[in-house]
Amino acid sequence: MAWGKLLNAGQTCIAPDYLLVQEEVKEEFLSLLAKEFDHLLGKNPQEQKHFVRIVSDRAFARLSGYLQYGTIYYGGKMDAKERFFSPTLLTDVDAASPVMQEEIFGPIFPVIPFSELSEAAEFVTKREKPLALYYFGVDG
């Protein structure tokens, strides 16, 4: 998941736009995903020359605006001059907010908790069909 979101700083059509995570493992999952981001990019990803920058000032401004729609669990560091945007995990995101209604096309990862698998399936099927959907779980 981390690699898929970080590839080209999330600026690919098949980058995952959000994560549905079972409530009972959410905190552990977030901690492990943050560690994986650190493993892949180090503690200061801005220093990594292989972590690409955001494609344009307009795209950077759009991504920056998305941060208001959740709580930053990890990341959230930005540099407009370099168009650097760190990998960012957002929690407490409203499903009706723009960050959940539009293709993100950047390194922001909203995390949406669910209790039952049927709840997650309903969440996905009520939305526009994504170009790609990735499932990681015990049953698949």
PLM segments and residue spans:
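Conserved C-terminal structural/oligomerization subdomain of aldehyde/semialdehyde dehydrogenase
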Residues: 84-140
